[in-house]
Design a protein with these regions (language model features):
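Short, acidic/polar
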Residues: 72-91, 203-214, 296-312, 332, ...
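Active-site-adjacent "subsite" loops/lids of carbohydrate-active enzymes
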Residues: 50-81, 150, 155-217
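Polysaccharide-binding and catalytic clefts of secreted carbohydrate-active enzymes
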Residues: 177-310, 322-323
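Catalytic domains of carbohydrate-active enzymes, especially glycoside hydrolases
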Residues: 81-108, 217-222, 312-316, 383-390
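Substrate-binding cleft of secreted/luminal carbohydrate-active enzymes
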Residues: 311-331, 338-417
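The substrate-binding groove and active-site-proximal loops of carbohydrate-active enzymes
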Residues: 65-77, 115-131, 190-205, 254-265, ...
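Sec-dependent signal peptide cleavage junction
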Residues: 19-38
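Aromatic-lined substrate-binding rim segments of carbohydrate-active enzymes
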Residues: 86-87, 103-153, 254-280
């Protein structure tokens, strides 16, 4: 091994020694990558989950907005009625998997020792709803022979002032308001948004501990991360933390660039999450739904090519291909092929995320979604021809919606086959 490389990587290994994992050093999008060490010994399972096994996944995302009360009625009964409706409507459209938000804002849809109760449940973050929503949602989903994946935003705490008020026990307030100044940068601000800072081993451990809570205590079929990694490619966002890393190095060490350092931080989080899940229950799947453009993903420190080719990161990838065949920047067919080519590990499933919310609307992609009423149908057919393992639709609220009714009707002709 090259001596310069050793000098470069050893300090980073020391920096993140709290969490063992796979570290990928990648200065450019397509440069050769070096791995140390990867979870090659982790047992991989061939079955999918609750009822799908090796069949086609037909999933729908259930975002926090779909779970939230529309009339400020925060009773246990009203929540259960909303979720019952979600399950019943999904069954009508041949959905066999629900991807349900359980941690949208550094919060929790169950009683957690780490994260406060979600504001979705009572209107106020931190308030106990008096029942276990996650337990109910899983039991209801399984009773209809559907799979349940717990959807987690790993870093997001607040987005555009949602939720409006963070609980005192929210990690942001806890770390910013205590007497310990050394943890102030464990959370970061960007405009009206707040995020956990994944460069610190302590922060990554807390995120992973939150996943452990779910997998240990609930019979989920999967854990699902979406595309929220580093929220910006602006290097000022975490410059002070990067400077801390630089100051920790010996004079002879060759530092990682800030881009390389960010990628290593995220890879440590992802591989650590995967390892933790498998150590508890090897049948629970771990998947990520990155944005469509791989180059943009890499700018946000998502090391797609490593995740898609090596053991120890994910069980599935579901790129959010919310684009149609006429998209002038990246067409659907081109994106499908790019991802098909990227996912070279036969142990990793390839699902395609479809932007159902765009169907029948003239608001997106220069109005090209109004050019036909069978775009989703053709996307399913093209995806199947490419060898994908299933589809995830965004989002549930557009399954039974006047805007998308014709598209859904045509898509069902092929999804039911």
């Amino acid at each position: 091994m090259d001596k310069k490389f050793i000098k470069k990587i050893v300090p980073l290994l020391l920096c993140i020694s709290l969490l063992s994992g796979t570290i990928i050093v990648s200065a450019k999008n397509n440069v050769e990558k070096t791995t140390i060490p990867e979870y090659s010994k982790t047992k991989l399972t061939s079955n999918y989950d609750y009822n799908i096994k090796d069949g086609e996944v037909k999933a729908v995302w259930v975002p926090f907005m779909s779970l939230e009360s529309k009339d400020n009625c925060y009773t246990e009964e009203s929540f259960k009625q909303r979720f019952d409706n979600i399950v019943e409507e999904s069954k009508k459209y041949s959905i066999n998997t629900l991807i349900v938000h359980v941690r949208p804002f550094g919060d929790s849809m169950y009683k957690s020792d780490i994260f406060p109760w979600s504001h979705i449940l009572t209107g106020t973050q931190g308030n106990d709803p008096g029942f276990d929503p996650l337990e109910y949602m899983i039991n209801k989903t399984h009773s209809e022979n559907m799979s349940f994946h717990a959807w987690v935003n790993p870093l997001r705490i607040q987005s555009n002032n949602t939720p409006g008020i963070l609980a005192d026990c929210n990690l942001y307030n806890k770390w910013r308001n205590d007497s310990d100044k050394s943890n102030d940068r464990w959370v970061l601000d960007l405009n009206n948004n707040k995020f956990l800072n994944p460069c610190y081993p302590e922060v990554r451990k807390i995120i992973i501990d939150g996943i452990r809570e779910i997998v240990e205590n609930y019979p989920v079929d999967g854990i699902h991360f979406d595309d929220y990694f580093y929220p910006t490619d602006n290097m000022d966002f975490d410059k002070e933390s990067y400077n801390e890393y630089l100051s920790s190095l010996s004079q002879t060490a060759i530092p990682l660039s800030q881009e390389e350092w960010r990628i290593a931080n995220i890879n440590s989080l992802i591989s650590g999450t995967y390892s933790e899940i498998k150590s508890i229950n090897s049948n629970v799947q771990f998947g990520i739904s990155p944005q469509a453009n791989i180059n943009n993903d890499i700018k946000m420190s998502a090391d797609i090519y490593s995740w898609a080719s090596k053991n120890g990161y994910v069980d599935y990838l579901c790129p959010q291909l919310y684009i149609n065949f006429d998209n002038p920047i990246l067409s659907y067919d081109k994106a499908v092929k790019q991802w098909r080519d990227a996912i070279t590990n036969p142990n990793i499933k390839y699902y395609i995320g479809l932007g159902l919310y765009k169907a029948g609307s003239d608001k997106y992609d220069d109005g090209t979604w109004k050019s036909a009423d069978n775009i989703i149908q053709k996307q399913v057919e093209y995806g199947r021809d490419s060898g994908c393992n299933g589809f995830m639709l965004y989002s549930w609220e557009f399954l039974n919606n006047s805007q998308t009714s014709e598209e859904i009707s045509n898509a069902m002709k092929v999804l039911n086959n």
